[in-house]
Amino acid sequence: MAPAIFGQGKNAPTVDELVSKNIEAKGGAGALRALQSLRLTGKLLVNQGQIELAYVQMKKRPGEVRTEGTLQGMTQIEAYDGKEGWKISPFQGRKDPEKMSADDVKSLMEDAEIDGPLVDWKAKGSVVDYLGTEDVDGTPAYKVKVVRKNGDVSYVYLDPDHFLEIRILTQRTKHGAYEEVETDLGDYEKAAGVFVATSIESGRKGAPDKQRVIIDKVEANGPVDDKIFHCPTASK
């Protein structure tokens, strides 16, 4: 049951109320501001869980991210330094860093958000609307539409009791084709006073084979060298 205070009809929540509840649920504005970097370590499961990669993701304000997946001595990397994205794809036979296209970088820019899509949405230039409740695997979640400055649209589903994100459905145009990516979030754990999802399952909406990230360790505000986010010079 949704809390009576935020029932449908005239007592429906406003966007500002939901965002405020989301910030409070994450640990509060002060704790969020104090969280300057995150290092998430765990495993990445692909191919319906048959293949397991060692997983590391590092995020640093104001908008840097680096994600690594390692298997049999090879490490794939995707990174964004706040301006441009790059990748190393050894599993596709490409061991030199390559610049990523503007379309490919969009998902990295969103990954880089330590706070998620709702916090500081006005400052980010987003447009946010509350669309009522919608069922998410049996939970009557609050559905919030976020139109980002780059044109991407994310539907953010908030748990009605805890006000944390449980699903984000993002729609974007990538290389001329429309795509929908669904990400389910759960198993929140606290780091430096902020709740962080440690179970992340994502893939194209409706696809049977989604990749799953299980985080075993969350480290907050540790030393992070800015160099790791910048594209190294490709070897000639």
Enumerate the predicted regions with their spans.
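N-terminal mature ectodomain segment of secretory-pathway/periplasmic proteins
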Residues: 16-93, 123-135
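Gly/Pro-enriched, hydrophobic low-complexity segments
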Residues: 7, 74, 137-233
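Acidic/charged, solvent-exposed loop-and-adjacent secondary-structure segments enriched in E/D, K/R, S/T
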Residues: 86-115
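Short amphipathic beta-strand/extended segments with alternating polar/hydrophobic composition
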Residues: 53-58, 78-82, 96-105, 158, ...
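Short, conserved active-site entrance elements at the starts or edges of catalytic domains
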Residues: 107-143, 164-167
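Hydrophobic h-region of N-terminal signal peptides that target proteins for export
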Residues: 1-7
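Intrinsically disordered, low-complexity boundary segments flanking structured domains
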Residues: 24-31, 113-118, 202
